[in-house]
A protein has these predicted regions:
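Domain-start "cap" segments at the beginnings of catalytic or binding domains
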Residues: 1-3
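Terminal amphipathic helices with adjacent charged low-complexity linkers/tails
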Residues: 5-10
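Short hydrophobic beta-strand motif reused across regulatory alpha/beta modules
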Residues: 12, 21-22
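A structural motif detector for beta-strand N-caps
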Residues: 15-16
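Iron-sulfur-associated redox domains of electron-transfer enzymes in respiratory
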Residues: 24-332
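Single conserved hydrophobic/aromatic residue that forms the stacking wall/gate
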Residues: 332-343
Length: 343
């Protein structure tokens, strides 16, 4: 996979029959942080309640503290900050189309393939980033580790240096807990002020927002193919006067590529999230607009087309010796095996 073509949707990791794709493991990096003097705080993605069904934030914090973390907070706190910024932008009517910028994979899709739509992408940091800044404002010397179901978040943390210090997947966390013989105990506690826990579901951002700006239609779109179709409609002037919640994963974050592989029940996952979310916003201290703003620039893609011999060599390295081995990865927009080798 060529990095400047990739949008980090993670579908190659999900569908590859040879398990050829591996995700960089940051557990050792986090262990080094924990061995230092600074407090290390976890920002836990709201999809955790789906991945670890029936295990609430209090129980997660107990387990993570045994690993050495200072404290555990919900990324949904940052989501509350972000959705409030979206509301303010819509109220100002500065632009007739606003696309949510929570999903780093969607952001990359627009930055690389739809530069004319960039002006509609909300210039707001992601919930992960907003929460990390909020934590560091309250605990100035803290290190922040995000834990969630997303491959793209590792790239987002690396690209925007100094905000999030490390990213772990649920799978990495689960394996680490098993190594230390730490068991997660069942138990959840309902909190009325926790509406942003809805964020990892399709339409979840919309459900947390005040949808009362006259003249705007509020839409939720998930899945890369549907996002591409919507972005083409925007380019062609078909869509206008709307706020679009856009997620690259079908089902939004609870359909993330590194939700643990044994855990593939979208209806149950959705119900876990909805039943855990409250009806009111978290109590948060808002960050100033400058701190939470984020600029997105066009990313130029440059490719040199390999020769036929080079393509065949690449396919052999991938273990694709026969035509039957040449899986058509249509989910990630590869129409033929030789094109797969090219990228």
């Amino acid at each position: 996979i060529v990095s400047n073509e990739c949008i980090l949707c993670g579908q190659c990791f999900v569908v590859c029959p040879q398990n050829a794709k591996e995700i960089a493991n940051d557990v050792e990096k986090v262990k080094v942080m924990l061995a230092g003097d600074e407090p290390v705080v976890v920002s836990l993605a709201p999809s955790f309640i789906a991945n670890y069904d029936g295990i609430g934030i209090e129980e997660m914090e107990k387990a993570l503290k045994k690993l050495g973390f200072h404290s555990v907070e919900e990324t949904a706190i940052g989501a509350t900050i972000v959705k409030t910024q979206y509301e303010e932008i819509l109220k100002s009517k500065r632009q007739n189309i606003l696309i949510s910028s929570c999903c780093h994979s969607v952001n990359l899709l627009i930055q690389k393939y739809f530069p004319h739509v960039l002006k509609y992408l909300a210039n707001v940091k992601s919930p992960m980033q907003a929460h990390a800044l909020d934590i560091k404002k309250r605990i100035p010397n803290a290190k922040v580790v995000f834990i969630g179901p997303c491959v793209a978040k590792k790239d987002e943390a690396d690209h925007y240096v100094g905000i999030v210090d490390a990213v772990l997947t649920y799978e990495e966390l689960t394996n680490w807990l098993k190594e230390q013989n730490i068991n997660l105990e069942k138990g959840t506690k309902y909190e009325e002020k926790s509406k942003a826990r809805l964020f990892p579901t399709t339409g979840g951002i919309l459900k947390t927002m005040e949808q009362n700006v006259a003249g705007y239609t509020y839409l939720a779109i998930d899945g890369v193919e549907n996002c591409i179709a919507a972005l083409k409609d925007i380019e062609n002037g078909v869509l206008t006067n709307c706020f679009i919640e856009m997620s690259s994963c079908v089902g939004s974050c609870i359909g993330g590529p590194v939700m643990e592989k044994y855990h593939r029940s979208p209806i149950r996952d959705y119900c876990s999230v909805v039943n855990y979310a409250g009806d009111k916003d978290f109590d948060v201290e808002m960050l100033d607009e400058f701190s939470v703003s984020k600029n997105f620039e066009y990313i130029v893609r440059k490719l040199e087309t390999p020769s036929e011999d080079e393509i065949r060599s690449i396919l052999r390295q991938m273990g694709k010796m026969r035509p039957s081995d040449e899986l058509n990865l249509s989910l990630i927009h590869i129409s033929e095996p030789t094109r797969q080798a090219e990228i």
